[in-house]
UniProtKB/Swiss-Prot annotation:
<keyword id="KW-0862">Zinc</keyword>
<dbReference type="GO" id="GO:0008270">
    <property type="term" value="F:zinc ion binding"/>
</dbReference>
<feature type="zinc finger region" description="RING-type; atypical">
    <location>
        <begin position="1148"/>
        <end position="1188"/>
    </location>
</feature>
<dbReference type="InterPro" id="IPR041249">
    <property type="entry name" value="HEPN_DZIP3"/>
</dbReference>
<feature type="compositionally biased region" description="Basic residues">
    <location>
        <begin position="658"/>
        <end position="669"/>
    </location>
</feature>
<feature type="compositionally biased region" description="Basic and acidic residues">
    <location>
        <begin position="670"/>
        <end position="693"/>
    </location>
</feature>
<feature type="compositionally biased region" description="Basic and acidic residues">
    <location>
        <begin position="648"/>
        <end position="657"/>
    </location>
</feature>
<keyword id="KW-0863">Zinc-finger</keyword>
<dbReference type="GO" id="GO:0000209">
    <property type="term" value="P:protein polyubiquitination"/>
</dbReference>
<dbReference type="Pfam" id="PF18738">
    <property type="entry name" value="HEPN_DZIP3"/>
</dbReference>
<feature type="region of interest" description="Disordered">
    <location>
        <begin position="637"/>
        <end position="698"/>
    </location>
</feature>
<keyword id="KW-0963">Cytoplasm</keyword>
<keyword id="KW-0175">Coiled coil</keyword>
<dbReference type="Pfam" id="PF24905">
    <property type="entry name" value="TTC3_9th"/>
</dbReference>
<comment type="function">
    <text>E3 Ubiquitin ligase proteins mediate ubiquitination and subsequent proteasomal degradation of target proteins. E3 ubiquitin ligases accept ubiquitin from an E2 ubiquitin-conjugating enzyme in the form of a thioester and then directly transfers the ubiquitin to targeted substrates. Able to specifically bind RNA.</text>
</comment>
<feature type="coiled-coil region">
    <location>
        <begin position="792"/>
        <end position="853"/>
    </location>
</feature>
<feature type="coiled-coil region">
    <location>
        <begin position="14"/>
        <end position="43"/>
    </location>
</feature>
């Protein structure tokens, strides 16, 4: 397991004896000497000794992996308070109490709790503590709580293992400890008798061992080749043991049952209630009710419970047939589902009938010959139905014979392991041979001698020892100190030592197999004996819940333990019943047939005057009457107690051999021997007189010895009814009344003297044997002392070497720790720098991303605004054209109404209707195209990738339409041909097709008709310029003036309009909007009225109702429709006007100064400004000051072709 020598872990007999002698010497030392010894103890030896003590307390520590051992040593060297334990030992020795062992489980748990509290109180982080050390402490604490075995300990241990699992999941470097977590939980489940859960945990632990070459899971080799060498081998051993426990020690036989403990089978849970199936071989299989349903549906679907009658036993390896099935829902109430019964073979008086009379009339025969009546059951017989008193009897039989033997054997095995027992038996062979070296032909194992000294030099197995043999070995081998009053006297109530309790248990065993077996017992007697036996078993180490379980178990389950009872009693239970029946029908004492040699009647008649046996004597007078009368039964009070019937048998044989060699002995006494033995003899004589005065007690002692002999007899696998015991009660009562006394005073005195003589002789022989034994043991102890001295010297050398090596390793560890600490500090500094740089980069990236998102959103909004402005700009001109066409249609309609006979006017009306409809269709088409592109831009499409919007073609000429309506061929020159001028659409992006190289054409404000003189009077040109009075309202004119003159306030413009209205007779209905703008400009700046009129005509082009600019207020507007001779063919893209080209340059509407080519800036909407004027405006507003079109500066989106202005 660790690097220490193997001698530290192998239990050497010499070392064990030395430890016992040192403990005995410590008891004799005073408190001062003890304190001095504590001070003299070298501190270097403390860790080694403590490690050995911890290994003894926790069995799992002996085979832990190498990776855990250094942490255990660290705990024992650094955190274990050895001085506290020494102070407790010193205090106990000063108070006169018995010194406790060097280390107890309670003290180890206390030290582990203190170490864990120190770690938790320090509030360390995962980087500051040793995770492996902390996990090792948790594991040791959980295993120690599991070893202690209290209910609250199981809960706390489960919590500690859960904490281990969570810590390991957080720290992957400690993943090897996960195997220990599942291993500890498996030990916990097995301690709770939840073997299925424990098996699952062991398999999980085995799976956690991944790499077979990982030396972390290795185990240090030992001298014992049977021990595992790796942790994996250890887990495989635990798995095999757990699988065996599932088949043997559990109650529920369903493999998937998680509550298979015996204590759960009758609790008020979902597992309450059980089914019991019994086969012809007396095998009993149990299932929880819920588990039985699952098992039956899985293995035998569709079958009911009664169909299992006669099927093969469910127990593996059993060849019997199921003969009985019980169901238990409430403790004590059993429902029989099916059974196979043959009632004519019950052992009862009613069923025996004539066979019973024949049994009573049989003559005296050899006791080894059984009567001809057959008492054997068929393989499918029903179990017996017991009376109330035998219900109590069998409960006591189970708790004393089975439970008592198990607990005493457990104590005996701890104190005397098989190797040491074999050695002690060889040493004391001469002492034991006189008691046990004789043949017991009816014992299945060959008798006690074959048990103590098996053939082929095998180790003796204590599992085959009965209670009395264990007591005899404890007595002769001095395993425990003798009781206060010795082995031959009943211990007082104040003596609660182990030896006294074992002696009391054997006493109750004798009473049970004698008086209680014959007479039964009442409920009060049962409760009294049960209380005393329970107290004895509790002091010996049995759990209270196990005792209560035996008491609450139904009689049907208790009686099924007769297999084990046959082994512990030494003779099969059916044979005991048969021999008792055979004995009582012949009138022979029960003691003479239960394992002892029968005393021949004739031999006793011929040797009436000879010496009687020192232990017990039967004087039987045979008369003419066929029945046998008992004369008197006397038993020597100085005989060996009834803990072993084998001793009594051997003494009886020795005395009988002496009787055949001698006839009489002289009535002499040795004075020296008498003086030495006077107190002992007087005590025994008083006891003898009491027993002679009470014949009932003599009969009781005989029955005790008879019951002791039954322990080592043969064993069979059948069980018989106890009803025949009532027959024995009847026979015993009939025979007891016929006993008479036949001796006189002279015979009694002679027997008393002879008894004393043999008593003294036996004591002398006993003293000689004791002297030889003590001499031999003293010599052997001297040899062992020399061997121990050599071992101690070698161990001291190894300890010194180990201490030097440990100190060297500690220095190396300290240097490595410092190096690791420096590396951790450097790593921490670099990590902090990396984190700061990462934080700065993340913040920078976040800022740029937010800016990018904002600019992207702004660009998207700008593109949408751009398309909306282009759409509104294009629709503005088309709507204006539609209005002009409507006006022309209205005029032509009015003229046609006044001249109904003119076909030319009717054709003109039809042509203008067609033009209006065509313009309206083009308006709808253009609006649809722009809206589709706006939606695509909103969906994420780039404006540069969209196809350009195609402008609709110009409407047909009215003259062509008129010719079509009149049905005439086209005329080259026509009087009615109008000229339609369409404003230019400036191109600002690839999505709009426009002639960018041509100058901007003025908006068409109206269409004038030039009619010939014969048709009618000419219409004044000014009439075509007047707008409809209904649409000219005050607010609309004010808004348009505000757009044309942004530097003026609304109040100032309103005042100018009022002045103009007063000048024209309180009405502006006769003035057009261009005339109003011209008049207002004169009011604002008379000096610049002419230039302002030009700029107003330029500004008003964005409004649907604006009129074209006029060079002079008095000059009439130019008509849109001209004769063919005066104007060339009109195109939709517009044509340049030579007159307009000759006009002066328009002023800047911001500063009202004239524009020059040097500092001219033209916006996408074709408005012109000074560069120094428009740039600050665009940086603040982002729109054209005239038409409010959204405009972007080049530096906002550098490199984007659609954002480049002609000149800024």
């Amino acid at each position: 397991m660790d690097s220490l020598p193997d001698e530290f872990f192998v239990r050497h007999p010499a070392v064990e004896d030395q430890r016992k002698e040192e403990t005995e010497n410590k008891l004799e030392k005073s408190s001062g000497q003890l304190n001095k010894q504590e001070n003299d103890i070298p501190t270097d030896l403390v860790p080694v000794n403590l490690l050995l003590e911890v290994k003894k307390l926790l069995n799992a520590i002996n085979t832990l992996p190498k990776g855990v051992v250094p942490h255990i040593k660290k705990f024992l060297q650094e955190d274990f308070s050895f001085q506290t334990m020494q102070r407790e030992v010193a205090a106990n020795s000063q108070n006169g109490e018995e010194i406790v062992p060097a280390l107890t489980l309670r003290f180890l748990i206390t030290q582990l709790e203190a170490a864990l509290r120190n770690i938790q109180a320090g509030n360390y982080t995962a980087h500051q503590i040793n995770i492996g050390y902390y996990l090792t402490l948790l594991f040791l604490y959980g295993v120690a709580l599991t070893e202690r075995g209290k209910k609250e300990d199981y809960t706390e241990a489960e919590n500690k293992f859960l904490v281990m699992k969570m810590m390991i999941q957080e720290n992957e470097i400690c993943e090897n400890f996960m195997s220990l977590v599942y291993f500890g939980r498996g030990l916990l489940r097995c301690a709770q008798k939840r073997y299925n859960g424990g098996l699952l945990e062991f398999h999980k632990s085995l799976q956690e061992i991944g790499d077979k070459n990982d030396h972390w899971f290795d185990i240090d080799p030992t001298e014992d080749e049977d021990l595992p060498t790796t942790f994996k081998d250890l887990l495989n051993n635990f798995i095999k043991t757990t699988e065996s426990n599932i088949m043997k020690q559990t109650i529920c036989s369903y493999l998937d049952c998680e509550r298979s403990c015996e204590a759960d089978i009758l609790k008020n849970t979902s597992y309450k209630g059980f089914f019991q199936l019994m086969c012809s071989k007396s095998c009993c299989v149990y299932f929880h009710k819920i588990c039985w349903k699952k098992f039956k549906n899985l293995k035998y679907p569709g079958e009911n419970d009664q169909s299992f009658s006669g099927k093969k036993c469910l127990k593996e390896g059993c060849t019997g047939d199921m003969v009985r099935m019980l169901q238990c829902d409430v403790p004590g109430i059993v429902k029989i589902l099916f059974e196979v019964v043959r009632k004519d073979e019950y052992i009862t008086i009613e069923n025996l009938g004539a066979s019973y009379r024949k049994l009573i009339s049989l003559k005296i025969t050899d006791t080894d010959i059984r009567p001809k009546i057959s008492l054997k059951f068929n393989t499918k017989d029903e179990m017996p139905i017991f009376k109330l008193d035998y219900n109590y009897f069998y409960h006591l039989l189970h708790i004393i014979i089975i439970s008592g033997t198990d607990i005493v054997r457990q104590i005996f095995d701890e104190a005397m392991p098989p190797p040491l027992l074999k050695k002690e038996l060889l040493i004391h062979k001469n002492v034991l041979e006189s008691y046990y070296n004789h043949l017991w032909t009816n014992h299945p194992l060959g008798g006690s001698w074959h048990l103590l000294y098996p053939p082929n030099k095998e180790l003796p197995q204590s599992k085959q020892f009965d209670l009395c043999l264990l007591l005899a070995l404890i007595k002769h081998l001095n395993v425990f100190p003798a009781p206060k009053k010795g082995w031959n006297m009943e211990p007082p109530s104040s003596d609660i030592s182990k030896s006294a309790d074992i002696l009391r248990l054997c006493k109750y065993r004798d009473i049970l197999l004698s008086e209680i077996l014959m007479n039964g017992l009442t409920e009060s007697q049962f409760n009294s004996i049960w209380k005393k036996v329970s107290d004895i078993l509790l002091r010996l180490g049995m759990m209270q819940e196990d005792i209560d379980k035996v008491k609450e178990n139904p009689i049907e389950n208790i009686s099924l333990d007769y297999h084990q009872l046959s082994v512990y009693l030494g003779i099969p239970v059916p044979e005991i019943i048969q021999r008792m029946l055979s004995c009582y029908q012949q009138g022979i004492a029960l003691q003479s047939i239960t394992g002892s040699q029968r005393i021949e009647i004739e031999e006793l008649q011929n040797e009436e005057e000879e010496l009687s046996p020192p232990l017990m004597e039967y004087n039987i007078n045979v008369k003419s009457h066929p029945e046998i009368q008992f004369a008197e039964i006397n038993k020597d009070g100085t005989s060996i107690p009834s803990e072993s019937s084998t001793e009594s048998l051997k003494d009886l044989q020795e005395v009988k051999s002496k009787q055949r060699k001698k006839k009489k002995t002289k009535n002499k006494k040795n004075k020296d021997s008498k003086e030495d033995q006077v107190p002992y003899v007087v005590e025994k004589e008083e006891q003898l007189r009491k027993e002679q005065a009470n014949p009932h007690s003599v009969s009781r002692l005989i029955k005790d010895d008879a019951s002791d002999v039954q322990e080592d007899s043969a064993m069979e696998d059948k069980f018989y009814s106890l009803d025949e015991l009532h027959i024995l009660d009847m026979i015993e009562q009939g025979s007891a009344g016929k006993v008479t006394t036949d001796y006189g005073e002279t015979e009694k005195e002679r027997l008393a003297r002879q008894r004393q003589l043999y008593k003294l002789h036996y004591q002398c022989e006993d003293f000689k044997r004791q002297l030889r034994t003590v001499t031999f043991r003293w010599q052997e102890n001297q040899m062992q002392i020399k061997k121990k001295d050599k071992i101690i010297a070698s161990l001291n050398q190894q300890v010194a070497f180990g201490i030097n090596k440990v100190s060297k390793l500690q220095r190396q560890i300290h240097a490595k720790d410092n190096e690791i600490k420096n590396l951790k500090e450097q790593l921490s500094m670099k990590r902090s720098q990396w984190e700061m740089e990462k934080h700065n980069l993340e913040s920078t990236m976040k800022t740029y991303v937010s800016k990018l998102n904002a600019e992207t959103s702004r660009a998207l909004t700008a593109e949408v605004y751009f398309l909306q402005c282009r759409r509104d700009f294009g629709l503005l001109h088309l709507e204006q054209t539609e209005k002009e066409c409507l006006n022309q249609l209205a005029r032509v309609t009015h003229m046609a109404a006044s001249n109904l006979e003119s076909l030319q006017l009717k054709a003109a009306v039809d042509s203008w209707n067609a033009i209006v409809a065509d313009v309206r269709n083009k308006i709808a088409f253009l609006r649809t195209q722009y809206n589709e592109q706006i939606n695509k831009v909103k969906q994420g499409f780039a404006l540069s990738t969209l196809p350009p919007v195609q402008l609709p073609p110009p409407p047909p000429s009215p003259e062509i339409l008129m010719q079509q309506f009149l049905g005439r061929p086209l005329v080259k020159e026509s009087f009615f041909r109008p000229i339609l001028t369409v404003p230019q659409m400036p191109a600002v992006c690839p999505g709009v097709v426009s002639a960018t190289g041509q100058p901007r054409a003025p908006l068409m404000t109206g269409i004038a008709w030039a009619l010939p003189a014969p048709v009618g009077d000419a219409v004044p040109p000014s009439a075509g310029l007047r707008s409809d009075p209904s649409i000219m309202n005050w607010e609309r004119i004010t808004d348009r003036l505000k757009t044309a003159f942004p530097q003026q306030t609304r109040k100032e413009l309103t005042d100018f309009l009022r002045k103009l209205k007063d000048a024209y007779g309180k009405s502006l209905s006769e003035l057009t909007f261009d005339e109003i703008v011209c008049k207002i400009s004169q009011f604002i700046d008379p000096k610049k009225s002419q230039s302002q009129g030009k700029s107003v005509s330029n500004v008003n082009c964005v409004s649907p109702s604006h009129s074209p600019s006029q060079p002079d207020a008095a000059q009439p507007p130019k008509p849109a429709w001209r004769p063919l001779t005066s104007q060339g063919p009109a195109t939709w893209e517009g044509a340049s006007n030579p007159d307009e080209e000759e006009e002066e340059e328009e002023p800047c509407v911001i500063c009202h100064e004239n524009l020059s080519p040097e500092n001219l800036s033209v916006l996408p909407c074709a408005h012109k400004f000074h560069a120094q004027c428009i740039r600050p405006w665009l940086m603040q507003q982002g729109t054209c000051p005239t038409c409010r079109l959204h405009v972007l500066l080049p530096e906002e989106f550098p490199g984007h072709p659609s954002r480049q202005l002609p000149k800024i």
